[in-house]
Regions:
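Ferredoxin-type iron-sulfur electron-transfer modules and their immediate structural context
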Residues: 1-61
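Short cysteine clusters
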Residues: 14-20, 24, 64-70, 74, ...
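Iron-sulfur (Fe-S) cluster-binding segments and ferredoxin-like electron-carrier domains
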Residues: 22-48, 73-93, 305-316, 321-323, ...
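Cofactor-cradling patches in redox/metallo enzymes
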Residues: 144-232, 267-363
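C-terminal amphipathic alpha-helical segment
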Residues: 236-283
Length: 363
């Protein structure tokens, strides 16, 4: 396996370092040393030195969520997410992907999403149909909401409808490339998906990214990969806050204490921590978990549940425990993947709400 000098420098700097050992959400959930960034770097270094085969470490390579908690706490600037993505890309080029990943990649290429699904649920189709007319604003729902959590996509649309917003939702939404980028990195096929998506999105002045996963890719990764995006991309929390502050969106504040689960894509990657909090504070009494904002702890997602569902439940259960530890009874999420993961691990003591649920007055 050939990796760049920069990648190898990061690998060799991380393989014997314990600085981020305590913060990896998957390492903490499994209790396995192999799940930590340090162990992943050690495995990669052994492959580059010929002591292990690439096949030997690939399951471990796909135990990383890419959440960047390790990068956040590293005072010396090393990046385990970067070298993990580099190895995935190289494994794809060498035909060394695990079968369960190969299947998801094939789904992405054939259907535009890792789940291999082609049509959203009927209720969502009806909601999309109400906004098929062309406008200068596009609501980009993303694969998780369209195919795995359509009821949440309907609620996202309902929030904008409550504000009287004029927007379009596509019956056939192009893949943003976020899932391909996570699975295999900056391959030609990934960039082709992104270019095709950009060609559609550039037909609008404003694109509202409902899913932080897509928001991060559209606003950061496209530029890194040389994909031209001329439209304004705004996250759903930021757009909803604009509607609230302009008086177009109305909410009712309840005496309900809640904590907010920051999606790492918003807090760490895009620096958006105040917009969701302003929205939540208008609807409920907001307090904080110990680790929040840029220091947030990832709570799981839908994509990784395709190959490690038990670990995802453990990751989510630990985050719920974090909320319980500060006496919280309600967690509000702004990411559909984390919402689904937390819901799957929901306990009687802690209620899980999406940001849309809160705005619409749901419990």
């Amino acid at each position: 396996m050939k990796l760049s000098e920069k990648v190898n420098q990061h690998v060799d700097s991380c393989r014997f370092c314990w600085m981020c050992h305590h913060i990896c959400p998957i390492g903490n959930a499994t209790g396995h040393e192999r799940s930590t960034p340090r162990a992943r770097a050690l495995g990669i270094s052994l492959v580059t030195r010929g002591a292990l085969r690439l096949d030997d470490i690939m399951d471990n390579i796909y135990e990383c969520a890419g959440c960047g908690a390790c990068v956040q706490v590293c005072v010396t600037g090393w990046d385990p997410v970067m070298f993990t993505k580099a190895v995935r890309e190289q494994a794809a080029l060498e035909g060394k992907l695990p079968e369960y990943i190969r299947k998801l990649v094939a789904n992405c290429l054939s259907s535009g999403n890792a789940y291999g699904m082609t049509e959203p649920a009927g209720e969502l189709q009806a909601a999309i149909g109400r906004h098929s007319a062309g406008t200068d604003t596009l609501l980009f729902l993303g694969a998780d909401a369209r195919y795995k959590m359509p009821e949440q996509a309907v609620k996202t649309i309902a929030v904008l409808e409550r504000a009287g917003a004029d927007f379009t939702v596509l019956a056939e939404e192009p893949a943003s490339g976020a899932q391909m980028d996570y699975l295999v990195g900056a391959l030609r096929e990934t960039k082709a998906q992104m270019q095709a998506c950009a060609a559609v999105l550039n037909g609008y002045k404003t694109v509202i990214a409902a899913d932080p996963t897509d928001a991060k890719v559209l606003r950061r990764t496209y530029a890194e990969y040389g994909v031209d995006l001329s439209c304004r991309v705004v996250t759903f929390p930021a757009y909803a806050l604009e509607l609230l502050q302009s008086g177009r969106l109305t909410v009712r504040k309840r005496e309900m204490p809640v904590v907010y689960q920051d999606p790492f894509q918003l807090s760490r990657d895009l620096g958006e921590t105040e917009e969701p909090r302003a929205l939540i504070s208008a609807c409920a009494d907001l307090s904080e978990m110990l680790l929040h904002g840029e220091e947030t702890v990832w709570a799981g997602n839908l994509l990784m549940a395709e190959w490690m569902p038990e670990v995802m439940r453990a990751v989510s259960a630990r985050r719920i425990f974090n909320a319980e530890s500060v006496g919280a009874k309600t967690i509000v999420t702004a990411c559909v993947g984390e919402y689904a993961a937390l819901k799957a691990a929901e306990t009687d003591g802690v209620n899980i709400l999406s940001l849309e649920d809160l705005i619409l007055g749901g419990n």
